[in-house]
């Protein structure tokens, strides 16, 4: 009987390999089982190490990018970078990678990009940043143009953050790299490579470790940032600049280590299973923008999924923009340099995030869905957004009204902007956590109950299209509102933003209610969700 089971298992495996045009392999039951187990464990460990290295670089680049932007530019400059520069740079990067994949495998392409990034970090730390005063226009060039309200009288004051983006191009370049690292290097290249190379069993073992790895990375990065920030504050200017360059040496070394880890991961997987040597090409039917809109018109469920993703992205982007707008004022009140103050806030945010991720690793939201149902998990993020709207925005509005008095009054009012900053940091961090740990998990649970016929195309629309539309709406709104009201910061029109965000919170909740209705129906019928493609 056992021999028959082994033969049946081998036949099934061989048929699968024939279907995928791969060479079949027959293993003995004992040796094959041991090899499979050790191979899966090795793959999970290697990919976990690679993910940890890439995530640590991402966490540190986030801190460095914020630090240099606060030191040389202003929060509204970040909005311009996100709304105007990030998207074309993303498309350019993707096109380069796609062309490179014609000649290189996914692992080799990732390693080439990591080596190029390592060289960039060295150049930035030793050439671009130390000599940026000689390479860039004079520090006071754009500041003189907009000083003393000269452009305010011409209703052109909103151009000031844009001028800073191009005159302070060194900090803009670093912020762009920091912004693109997480979305392109990790999300686009690493995860597509992991899914491409790993078996289904290896992916199932690897995915639960992501939360734990991210928690450890954020905790260690937050503690290190806090420690370096304290040391940096006690140093003279030239020593601070030297320490900054040394940080880029470490970042470059970590990037090289990531490339080496990637290389050995590929070699180890190929050695354990020769099937990984060949590249599999899967043709996926692509749906354009017009096709996505037509499908959303037909399916109310898909429209609700996309609306919820767009609303979540818009709310989180605007909350963060308004929070960042008050950091400069908080630094002035606390008599701290802007970069040091920003580092302190980022370090605390990373530590808070790590604590929540550790809790969620041991008490995942998937268990809450099984116990409490889908709706309580999905509604957590919009409730946190509404709480932030009610608590944080009035605080910003009051501080805007009394801004001149608060800055001039000295010790009597010290703490109002600082309190706003720490409240904003905590609430935006909680929004981010609730979005990733609750809303995204609930969205994935609903997506899994969609028929496999539509699942891939639906996910491409509500995740791929929805997230990009949400980010674009948030960034473009923040940029346009400064133009319309002729202000330098979106924080100055928080009353308008309250209404705008409130509308998207309502859209978010309404979409969740519809998804919950369809999810419940599918559970009761013990069938896939009715996506209503035949309707409308």
UniProtKB/Swiss-Prot annotation:
Top-level taxon of origin: Eukaryota
TM spans (from-to): 44-64, 77-97, 109-129, 172-194, 205-225, 244-264, 309-329, 349-369, 378-398, 465-485, 493-513
Cell location: Cell membrane
GO cellular component labels: plasma membrane
Keywords in alphabetical order: ATP-binding, Cell membrane, Glycoprotein, Membrane, Nucleotide-binding, Transmembrane, Transmembrane helix, Transport
Protein's membrane topology: Multi-pass membrane protein
Keyword Glycoprotein tagged: yes
Function description: ATP transporter involved in the uptake of ATP from the host cell cytoplasm. Provides the microsporidian cell with host ATP in exchange for ADP. This is an obligate exchange system. This energy acquiring activity is an important component of microsporidian parasitism.
Name of the protein this chain belongs to: ADP,ATP carrier protein 4
Organism annotation: Encephalitozoon cuniculi (strain GB-M1)
């Amino acid at each position: 009987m056992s021999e028959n089971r082994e033969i049946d298992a081998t036949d099934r495996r061989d048929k699968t390999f024939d279907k995928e045009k791969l060479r079949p392999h027959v293993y003995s039951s004992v040796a094959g089982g041991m090899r499979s187990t050790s191979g899966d464990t090795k793959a999970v460990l290697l990919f976990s190490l690679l993910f940890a290295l890439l995530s640590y670089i991402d966490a540190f680049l986030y801190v460095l990018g914020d630090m240099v932007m606060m030191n040389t530019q202003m929060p509204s400059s970040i909005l311009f970078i996100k709304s105007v520069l990030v998207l074309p740079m993303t498309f350019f990067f993707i096109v380069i990678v796609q062309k490179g994949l014609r000649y290189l495998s996914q692992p080799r392409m990732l390693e080439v990009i990591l080596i190029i990034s390592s060289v960039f970090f060295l150049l930035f730390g030793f050439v671009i940043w130390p000599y940026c005063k000689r390479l860039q226009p004079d520090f006071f060039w754009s500041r003189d143009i907009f000083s003393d309200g000269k452009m305010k009288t011409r209703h052109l004051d909103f151009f000031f953050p844009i001028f800073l983006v191009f005159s302070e191009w060194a900090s803009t370049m670093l912020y762009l790299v920091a912004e693109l690292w997480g979305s392109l290097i990790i999300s686009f290249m690493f995860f597509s490579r992991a899914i491409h190379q790993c078996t289904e069993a290896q992916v199932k073992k690897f995915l639960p470790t992501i939360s734990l790895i991210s928690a450890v990375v954020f905790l260690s990065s937050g503690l290190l940032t806090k420690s370096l920030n304290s040391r940096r504050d006690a140093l003279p200017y030239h020593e601070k600049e030297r320490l900054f360059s040394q940080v880029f040496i470490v970042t470059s070394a970590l990037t090289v280590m990531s490339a080496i880890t990637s290389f050995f991961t590929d070699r180890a997987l190929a050695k354990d299973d020769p099937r990984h040597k060949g590249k599999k090409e899967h043709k996926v039917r692509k749906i354009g923008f017009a096709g996505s809109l037509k499908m959303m018109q037909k399916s109310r469920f898909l429209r609700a999924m996309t609306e919820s993703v767009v609303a979540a992205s818009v709310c989180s982007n605007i909350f963060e923009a308004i929070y960042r707008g008050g950091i400069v004022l908080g630094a002035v009140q606390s008599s701290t340099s802007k970069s040091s103050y920003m580092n302190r806030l980022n370090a605390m945010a990373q530590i808070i995030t790590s604590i929540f991720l550790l809790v969620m690793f041991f008490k995942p939201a998937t268990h809450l869905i099984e116990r409490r149902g889908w709706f309580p998990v999905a509604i957590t993020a919009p409730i946190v957004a509404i709480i932030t709207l009610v608590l944080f925005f009035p605080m910003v509005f009051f501080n805007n009204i009394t801004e001149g008095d608060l800055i001039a009054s000295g010790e009597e009012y010290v703490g109002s902007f600082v309190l706003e900053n720490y409240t904003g940091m905590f609430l935006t961090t909680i929004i981010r956590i609730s979005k990733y740990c609750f809303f995204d998990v609930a969205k994935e649970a609903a997506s899994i109950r969609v028929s496999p016929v539509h699942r891939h195309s639906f996910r491409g629309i509500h995740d791929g299209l929805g997230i990009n539309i949400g980010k674009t709406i948030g960034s473009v709104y923040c940029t346009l509102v400064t133009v319309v009201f002729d202000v330098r910061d979106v924080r100055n029109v928080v009353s308008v933003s309250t209404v705008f965000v409130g509308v998207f919170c309502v859209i978010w909740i309404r979409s969740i209610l519809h998804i919950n209705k369809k999810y419940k129906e599918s559970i009761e019928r013990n069938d896939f969700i009715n996506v209503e493609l035949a309707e409308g």
